[in-house]
Amino acid sequence: MAKILILANSSSGLYGFRNELVVKLLEQHEVHVSLPDDTNNRELEEEGCVLYRTPINRRGMNPIQDIGLFRAYRKLLKDIRPDVVLTYTIKPNVYGGLACRVGRVPYIANITGLGS
């Protein structure tokens, strides 16, 4: 059973727009999710995801906070040892992608929205 780590900046977005994918992944994989405390964390846990509460300032531009996020992602990669990482939204894409690159973990970055 492969381990998949999902990095996102809100459980409401992940649960509201990507829950079908999460449920499908749970059928054959161990799914770990890194999120800040949010409205749908409990629902994701009840479905079978292993949750890690990672604070993210979604709109902030504080480089110290962003370095902290990068370090938190590096620690998660070391602790979980996922086979692949799936990232959503800008900060998880950027800092999760960098952490995966440094840790040599394959990752898939997703951009949300209409692209306009």
Predicted regions, residues:
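Structural signature of beta-strand start/N-cap positions in the alpha/beta core
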Residues: 3, 30, 81-84, 106
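Nucleotide-sugar donor phosphate/pyrophosphate-binding loop at the beta->alpha transition
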Residues: 14-17, 64-71, 106-108, 115-116
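An amphipathic, basic-hydrophobic alpha-helix
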Residues: 58-84, 94, 98, 102
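Short beta-strand scaffold positions
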Residues: 35, 86-87
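N-terminal strand-loop element at the rim of the active site
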Residues: 6-65
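Short His-centered aromatic/hydrophobic patch
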Residues: 87-93, 111
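Active-site proximal beta-strand in glycosyltransferases
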Residues: 2-5, 100-116
